[in-house]
């Protein structure tokens, strides 16, 4: 019989940890300190995506490139558009100019004149430079996430990789303080490194959640009753290879291996699996929602601090570099508690007798597992339709965000503090949207797919409104069609509302189409589709901007990009998808274990906005 550990935390929980399933398996109950470490990293890193990527990083890259560029109109006159040199043009005072950009939107103003730079002899718009940088960082991020998933899931590298990526990303962000405009290419490199490391570290952070849930004292003390199967023995050989076994080595499954097997031996797989995991999913949602809330609170606090710093330092290029340093410092500082308090929680060795311990074997295993999942998806028509729609929709969400910030800066002349405020408004609207869409869905008795369609239609209003600026009658008014800075604020509200709904309902809708027992593998494919799609949209917007010399024509592309998922989503048949998924699950149930995909467990975690609605 397994002896209970004698640590104070375990005694306080009054639970006996199950026996290890493999050498090095850490089955100790989740402690409050471990949870605090997990929350701490959300508090640390969430500021990067909200404050840096959502506000200050794109405009910093554009501004530094602008100061080294020349006017598009004659390709000779330098674009010396520092924020401080223009501040005196407004008599309203430092704080009032946050909301008053009318002085800078006149034709020929250095703030709104389109500027170009030359990289390897190629002419690039300064706004396009920021978009290309983002696309490249997302591409590298997607490759890295797939490649490292094997090492993160199998072996003792999970925590080590998280800390390494956090340190590299935070230091890269802090180094912006030393990047002067003539080194803008170095700034682009730091942006790529920091965004790549952020994405990788957050995926690793998400991989801890199912482990924290699985070994939570509430669940470990409940073996044998409630939603946990009874009569199961914690056999240390339960992960042995053999025909007919499910993936017992998947480190982030909410149920332990013996629970997964019982869940599929009692008849109707779908209903049994749901009943066995309901308690785990409730706890997972609770912990994840707490982490989301903590991360958002930290992001809002730092965003407010950044706006104050930018205003008080007169909104110069140095102001932008300074706030990026503060963002990196925040990220670095609050990573320390996570590094101290999170347990390593090693994963099992690579299965099937594969050679382990080398990075090449981990990478090969990860890519082969992804390939198996992709091949399996070919037989699920509705999942293919949904993933195609999600690919386009996710790309549209990411592209609209970056395009809007750069459009507001380069064509509306909005100052950094005002751009930061737009992001705060959108985030608050997103939290409200995550809750309000569920109310709308219940009120009008909408299915998940219908709610997604409603969100898409509302989202389509954003680029269509920008296209109104091409209509001569509206253009002559001098407002409407994104001709005035104040118009960005209501559009920020719409964007936030849509984000809150789409992120919640798309994931839950996709979950209905997944074969029972293969959630982690298919959610990994969902996450990779999400991450990888953002490579294309920003790059295409950059190409359009280079071609026409301004960002507004890119609204045509954005309108098409957002509209394309609509017919695909309407073609998805949920009932047919469920039948196909269950049939495939039954077909694969008796296959040898080596055919069962395990890839992508590190992404098996609801994302931030998704859990707000649950």
UniProtKB/Swiss-Prot annotation:
The keyword Flavoprotein does not apply. One of its GO terms (molecular function) is transmembrane transporter activity. It is found in: Vacuole membrane. It comes from the Eukaryota. The keyword Protein transport does not apply. Residues 1-29, 229-254 are annotated as: Disordered. The chain crosses the membrane at residues 41-61, 126-146, 160-180, 185-205, 291-311, 322-342, 383-403, 417-437, 452-472, 486-506, 523-545, 554-574. It is a multi-pass membrane protein. InterPro entries: Atg22, Atg22-like, ATG22/LtaA_families, MFS_dom, MFS_trans_sf. GO terms for biological process: amino acid transmembrane export from vacuole; autophagy. Glycans are attached at residue 3. Residues 230-254 have a biased composition (Polar residues). Keywords: Amino-acid transport, Autophagy, Glycoprotein, Membrane, Transmembrane, Transmembrane helix, Transport, Vacuole. GO terms for cellular component: vacuolar membrane. Belongs to the ATG22 family. PANTHER family: AUTOPHAGY-RELATED PROTEIN 22. Vacuolar effluxer which mediate the efflux of amino acids resulting from autophagic degradation. The release of autophagic amino acids allows the maintenance of protein synthesis and viability during nitrogen starvation. This is Autophagy-related protein 22-1. It comes from Aspergillus niger (strain ATCC MYA-4892 / CBS 513.88 / FGSC A1513). The gene is atg22-1.
């Amino acid at each position: 019989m397994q002896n209970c550990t004698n640590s104070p935390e375990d005694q306080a929980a009054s639970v006996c940890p199950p026996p290890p399933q493999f050498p090095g398996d850490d089955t100790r109950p989740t402690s409050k300190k471990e949870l605090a470490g997990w929350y701490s990293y959300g508090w640390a890193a969430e500021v990067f995506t909200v404050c840096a990527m959502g506000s200050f990083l794109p405009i910093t890259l554009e501004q530094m490139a602008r100061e080294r560029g020349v006017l598009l109109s004659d390709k000779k006159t330098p674009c010396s558009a520092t924020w401080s040199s223009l501040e005196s043009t407004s008599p309203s005072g430092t704080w009032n100019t946050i909301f008053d950009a009318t002085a800078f939107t006149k034709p020929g103003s250095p703030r709104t004149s389109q500027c170009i730079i030359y990289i390897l002899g190629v002419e690039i718009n300064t706004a396009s430079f920021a978009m290309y940088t983002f696309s490249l960082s997302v591409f590298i991020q997607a490759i890295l996430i797939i490649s490292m998933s094997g090492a993160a899931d199998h072996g003792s590298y999970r925590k080590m990789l998280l800390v390494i990526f956090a340190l590299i990303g935070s230091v890269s962000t802090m180094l912006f303080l030393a990047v002067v405009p003539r080194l803008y290419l170095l700034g682009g490199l730091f942006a790529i490194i920091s965004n790549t490391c952020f994405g990788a570290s957050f995926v690793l952070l998400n991989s801890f959640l199912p482990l924290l849930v699985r070994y939570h004292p509430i669940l470990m003390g409940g073996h044998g009753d409630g939603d946990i199967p009874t009569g199961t023995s914690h056999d240390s050989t339960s992960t042995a290879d053999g025909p007919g076994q499910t993936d017992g080595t998947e480190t982030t499954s909410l149920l332990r291996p013996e629970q997964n097997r019982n869940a599929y031996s009692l008849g109707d797989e779908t209903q049994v699996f749901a009943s066995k995991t309901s308690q785990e999913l409730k706890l997972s949602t609770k912990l994840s929602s707490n982490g989301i809330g903590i991360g958002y609170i930290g992001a809002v606090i730092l965003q407010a601090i950044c706006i104050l710093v930018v205003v008080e330092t007169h909104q110069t290029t140095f102001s932008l570099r300074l706030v990026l340093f503060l963002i990196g410092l925040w990220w670095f500082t609050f990573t320390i508690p996570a590094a101290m308090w999170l347990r390593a929680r090693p994963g099992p060795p690579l299965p099937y007798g594969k050679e382990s311990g080398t990075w090449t074997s981990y990478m090969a295993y990860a890519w082969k597992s992804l390939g198996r999942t992709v091949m399996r998806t070919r037989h699920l028509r509705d999942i293919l339709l949904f993933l195609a729609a999600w690919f386009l929709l996710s790309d549209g969400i990411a592209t609209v965000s970056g395009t809007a910030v750069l459009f507001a800066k380069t064509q509306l002349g909005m100052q950094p503090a005002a751009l930061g405020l737009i992001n705060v408004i959108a985030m608050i609207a997103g939290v409200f949207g995550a809750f309000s869409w569920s109310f709308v869905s219940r009120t009008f008795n909408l299915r998940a797919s219908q709610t997604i369609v409603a969100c898409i239609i509302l989202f389509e209003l954003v680029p269509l409104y920008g296209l109104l600026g091409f209509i001569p009658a509206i253009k002559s008014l001098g407002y409407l069609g994104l001709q005035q800075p104040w118009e960005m604020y209501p559009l920020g509200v719409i964007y936030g509302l849509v984000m809150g709904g789409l992120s919640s309902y798309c994931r839950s809708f996709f979950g209905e189409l997944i074969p029972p027992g293969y959630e982690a593998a298919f959610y990994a494919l969902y996450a990779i589709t999400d991450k990888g799609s953002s490579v294309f949209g920003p790059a295409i917007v950059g190409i359009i901007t280079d071609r026409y010399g301004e960002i507004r024509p890119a609204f045509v592309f954005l309108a098409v990009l957002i509209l394309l998922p609509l017919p695909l989503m309407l073609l998805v048949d949920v009932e047919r998808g469920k039948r196909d998924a269950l049939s495939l699950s039954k077909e694969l149930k008796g296959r040898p274990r080596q055919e069962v995909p395990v890839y992508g467990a590190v992404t098996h975690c609801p994302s931030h906005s998704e859990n707000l609605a649950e």
